[in-house]
Amino acid sequence: MNALKRLGTTLAKNGDQIIEGTKELDQISVKYFLGNTRVSNNEKSLVSISSNKSRLNFNQLIKDNAHLIGKGSQYQRKVVKHYLSPLIGHKLRRQDIHNDYNKQLSHTDHIITPTDRKREAFSSMELAVDILPLLIKSTKKPVTKPAKRRLFKPYYTKEVPPIPDFKGDMKLFEDYIALLTHTKFLYKNSSSSNGIIPKILRVLIHPSNLNTIDLRSVQCYNDILYFYSKKYDFATCRELFAQMKVEGCKPNTTTYNILLLNLVKKVHMRKIRSIKNELLFYLRNMQKNGIFCDTVTWNTCYNFLNDEMSRDLYIEKLIDCGVPLTSELVYSVVRNSSKAHISTKTKYILDMFGEDGESFVNLKFVNLLISDLVLDHNVERAWSVLRYFELKQLKFVNQPKFLINSETMNTFLRYFAEQGRIDLCFLTYNYFVKDLVGPNKIRPNVNTFDMLMKSLVKNGYTETLPTVFEVICALSERYGIKIRNDGYWSLKCKAIIKFQYKSSSCEKNKTELLNKLNNFSWGKQLPLFTTKVWKNGNSEVRKICRMLGSIPIPLRKSRKLGDKETVDRSQNRSVSEKKKAYRNRIKYIAIGNAMARRIPYANNWHQSFKDEVTKRGLLASER
C-alpha cells in the first residue's frame, strides 16, 4: 500500500488542509417547473394488450412493422444520422456507418484470443510518465476546487415536468436541462434510453433548433454529457463535444472531467484498443485551449494507474504541485488499494481517521468500508463500523453531516437477501428506517424493496409467502414506490404465487404481520446484532419469524415420500415450465410495448414526438 501510506503520512502532517469541496449548495426542485396544475397520470397506453383480440393486433402490428423497428432495420442508426445531418460538413464517425462488420471474424477472434490479452497492454508507469507533465503544465496555482454543488432528487415517480416557455431565459433553460439529466423519472420509464427524456434533450439541443441555440451554455452541454455518460453512450458524448466546438461553445474543466471519466469506464470494459491515445488527446487539448486542471481532474487520472509504483509516484507529484487533498482523492486511493486483507485495510483506515477525522470522513467512505467488509463475509464487523459512524454523526451538531444513507442499508440487505434471510432483512430494514440514531432517518428506494423480494424468493416456498409479498407491496406504497410489474424479483414472486399457491394472502394475516413488524428491529426485540435470530430471540421474535416463513431448515415441516400431498416430479416440472412461460410472456409484452412505441417514430419522428408530448401534457404553453 505505498500510495495509501504516503497519503496517510501527508494526512497526519497536514490533516487540517483536507477539503470536502465547496459547501455552497444550489437546490433545483421538480416543483419549480410544475406550477399549480398537475398532469393526469391516467392516460391510455400507446398499445392496449388487455384482451386476447388486442394482443393479436399487438403481435400483428410488430410483425407488419418489423422492417422499421426489427432486426436489420437500423432504427437507432437512422436516428443518430438524422441528428447529425446539420453537421454534415464536419467529420464525425457515425455520420456514415458502413455495413462491413464481419461477425464471423469477430466471433472467431473472441474465441481464440485469451481473455488476459483482450486489452492492449501498456505499462502503468509509462502512462504516469506521459500524463504527469501534461497535468503539471495545465495546473494553475492555487489549484481550483470543485464548482458549486447542486442538489437533485435521485428519482421521481410522477410525470416529467412540462417543457417551459423559456423566452430567452438562459438560467431557466439550464435548470430544466439539469433536472432532466440528474433526476431519474420512473413514470413510464421516462429516463430510459427509449423514454421521453432523451428525445426531449435531443430536440432542445438539436443543431438545427434555432430557438434554443442562444440558450445553450457550457453548463447545459456538461449536464447532457453527464446524462449520456451514465448510460455508457460514449459515442454521443464525443458527438456533443464536437457540436460544442462547431457552435463556438468553449468547453471548461468540467467538460473534460466528464470525458476523462468516460475513459475510466472504458478501462474496465473488455476492449482490444487502448485508451492511452485518447487520454493523451484530451489532456493535450486542455493544454492547447488553456483549460486548467482542478482537483477532480487529478483524482480522475489517478484511476487510470494500476500498480503501486505508478500510484506512489503520482501521489508524490500531486502533493508537490500543491493540489489540495480532497475526500474524493482519499476515497480513490483507498478504493484502488489492495483488497487482499480487507480487515487489515479497514483498521488502517479507521486509525487514519483518528479521533477528529471530520475533515474527510464522508458518505462514500462509510459505504466503501461496509461494502468491503460485507463482501468479505465479515458482516458483524461491518455492523460495528456502521454503529461507529452512526454515533459519529451526533458530533456534527451545528452542521449536520450524513454518513449513512439508503445505499448503506441496501448493502446489508443485498447480502442477507442472497442467503434468503428474510428475518435479517426486515430487522435491518426497520432499524434503518425507524430506529437509526442520527440527524436523519433513511428513506428506502426501489432497490430496497427489490432486495426484500429477493430474500422472500430465496427463503423458499413457505406457507406465508403470499402474505409477506403483500406486506412488502404495502410498505413500498407508504413511500410512493410502485412495484414494477416487469421487475425480476417481483415477477418471480408473482409467478410462484400464481402457480404454487391455491389461494392468495388473507387480509387479516397481512394486517397482523404489519403490526408485528413495527417493533421487529435491532435494539428493541433483539438488543444486539446477531445472525442467530431464532436461537437468541424470545418467543415473540420466533412468532414473527414463523409468520415470515423464516424457520431454521432442521425445524421446518418435511413431507415424506409416501404422503398424499407430495407432488410427483413430472407435476413439479410442469409447474416450473408454467412459471417460466408466465415470466417470459410478461417480458415479451414489455419488449413488445417498447418496440411498438418506436413504430410512429420510425415513420415520422418529429410528428410522433409532438403527439407524445401533447398527449402527456408536457408542453407548458398548451396547458
From Swiss-Prot:
PROSITE patterns: PPR. This is ATPase expression protein 3. GO terms for cellular component: mitochondrial inner membrane. PPR repeats lie at residues 217-251, 252-292, 362-396, 405-439, 445-479. NCBIfam families: PPR (TIGR00756). GO terms for biological process: mitochondrial translational initiation; mRNA metabolic process. It is found in: Mitochondrion inner membrane. Keywords: Membrane, Mitochondrion, Mitochondrion inner membrane, Repeat. Required for respiration. It is a peripheral membrane protein. The keyword Transcription does not apply. Pfam families: PPR_2. Its main location: mitochondrion. It comes from Candida glabrata (strain ATCC 2001 / BCRC 20586 / JCM 3761 / NBRC 0622 / NRRL Y-65 / CBS 138) (Yeast).
